[in-house]
Amino acid sequence: MNSGNAKLIKEIKKWRKIMKYKLIATDMDGTLLNDEHLISEGNIEAIKEIQKKGVKFVLASGRPSFAMFEYAKELEMVRYGGYVLAFNGGQLIDMKDGKMIFHEGLDWDDIRKIYELSCEIEIPMALYGEDTVYASKDTENTRFEAKLCGMKFREFGSLEELDGYGIKETTKCMLISDPEKVKKAEEHMKSKYGNEYFIAISKPIFLEIANKNINKGKTLRQLGELTGIGMEEMIAVGDSYNDIPLLEVVGMPVAVSNANEEIKAKSKFESTSNNDDALKTVIENFFR
């Protein structure tokens, strides 16, 4: 525990006595995963241990579900009945039986509007098929997204071409560029479509656009209703702007030490960094 958390020792002991947490939901990139996009052995063992004790574990990411399953299997979430909350809440999957509990996304008209705006501000748009990332421009950053997700990559030059690939809907779209352009794109997108979509920067080069009725927090709340676990009985861990809805709905919001300041301001506890067993630190502080 870092010095900034030292003053919270007494509070943690009090929280342990008052509340028995039954679920942990964590972001992946920048939180659970280290900078090599791996789960540390310390995190793996700690997460398996609490699942053995009956605590439910949820992977909550902006990633497509396709890019989350291997991590879920590594954590034995199939065995223990964990959940994958993908696309920032656009999909919720029960790993025990592989069933899709919830899905909500963007239709063709949404895709068209976002694509036209991306052309207007000259920033590539990407969206997701079943196993392929489709991007309006082949760049290092758009290919990086496909590589990060373990998906195929295909460039499209027009909506007609995209339609030809059989894409009629998607769970989310992304505008992908350098951080300065992405920040400007966020401002432009929110000024034009802020009331129509959920818009958030997940990583400096990624602006995510999804159905306005979804975010990580709303979908986690649905999971709480399904399982009978109260929101006050949940811990959530995150590092970036798309994690804010997640942190706002749980009893114990946690930021990793590498999180931005806005995320830290939303948290009650600061864990170690994503490169220093952040989830293990959370588990040691709230379950032992």
Language model regions located:
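Conserved acidic, metal-coordinating active-site core of Asp-based
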Residues: 117, 121-237, 244, 258
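Asp-based phosphoryl-transfer active-site loop
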Residues: 22-36
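Short active-site oxyanion
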Residues: 54-58, 82, 172, 232-233, ...
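Active-site phosphate-binding/coordination module
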Residues: 41-142
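Active-site metal-binding loops of divalent metal-dependent hydrolases
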Residues: 28, 63, 238-240
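Non-catalytic pre-domain segments flanking phosphatase-related domains
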Residues: 1-26, 45-48, 52
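Mg2+-dependent phosphoryl-transfer enzymes with acidic/Ser/Thr/Gly-rich catalytic loops
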Residues: 19-23, 40, 208-288
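Short, acidic loop-to-helix structural element flanking the phosphoryl-transfer center
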Residues: 37-54, 103-110, 157-158, 211-225, ...
